Design a protein with these regions (language model features):
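Formylglycine-dependent sulfatase
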Residues: 1, 5-217
């Protein structure tokens, strides 16, 4: 888990005047309060504390709870009518799991570890309750992170910027959007790679439109 005292590339670039952003899969921790976060309030360690001016991230990965995006230290699209509770120790009463309720899963079988809370028809690592409108839909993850990444590029086109863009596409659970399903002979993994290619293509298209391609690594 990264902590604010660790020096990383984004710190050096920020010192050099770069706008810094991170979008997508994170899984590098949210500070030293792991397991103690109140997901219904600003998180004690935001990515701003770790050197990023802007962040739109998964708390960890798509196969783990909570299945919500964190934007600048707070749950994106937070739904006050569905407060979020998370545990990696035990389930919440009445909440279905992949182990006990496999009939609720969407075309995927539970596996050891990935057999706990069911969100969007997929069993995850860990247990959660609530979320409501803040819960992501796995088939829309690529569209969501691409949209926020493009917004970051456009908002910082007039100055140097550094963006860490991490997709979840080939990481389990592979759940590409319908428009990519069946596009690759390698099955769902191949379809997820098609979706990844599209994501990179959208960012490249944006750089072209902004006239930044030749000045971007």
């Amino acid at each position: 888990s990264l902590v604010g005292s660790e020096m990383c590339i984004r710190d050096r670039l920020k010192e050099a005047g770069y706008a810094t952003g991170v979008v997508g899969k994170w899984h590098l921790g949210l500070g030293d309060k792991a397991g103690e976060q109140d997901w219904n309030a600003p998180l004690p360690t935001a990515l701003g504390d770790l050197g990023f001016d802007y962040s739109y991230i998964m708390a960890a990965t798509a196969d783990r709870v909570p299945c919500v995006f964190i934007e600048n230290g707070q749950v994106a699209n937070y739904d006050p009518d569905a407060p979020i509770y998370v545990s990696y120790q035990q389930n919440f009463p009445g909440e279905p799991t992949g182990k006990d309720n496999p009939e609720l899963l969407y075309n995927q079988k539970p596996s050891f570890g990935h057999d706990q809370s069911i969100v969007n028809g997929i069993s995850r690592i860990g247990y959660m309750k609530g979320g409501g409108k803040a819960l992501w839909k796995d088939e829309n993850i690529a569209d969501s992170i691409v949209t926020h990444a493009i917004d970051f590029i456009k908002e910082n086109k007039e100055k140097p910027f550094f963006m860490y863009f991490a997709t979840n596409d080939v990481h389990v659970p592979r759940f590409p959007h319908d428009r990519f399903r069946g596009k690759n002979p390698m099955g769902v993994r191949g379809d997820a790679i098609e979706q990844f290619d599209w994501s990179v293509g959208q960012l490249m298209k944006t750089l072209d439109e902004m006239g930044l391609t030749e000045n971007t690594l």
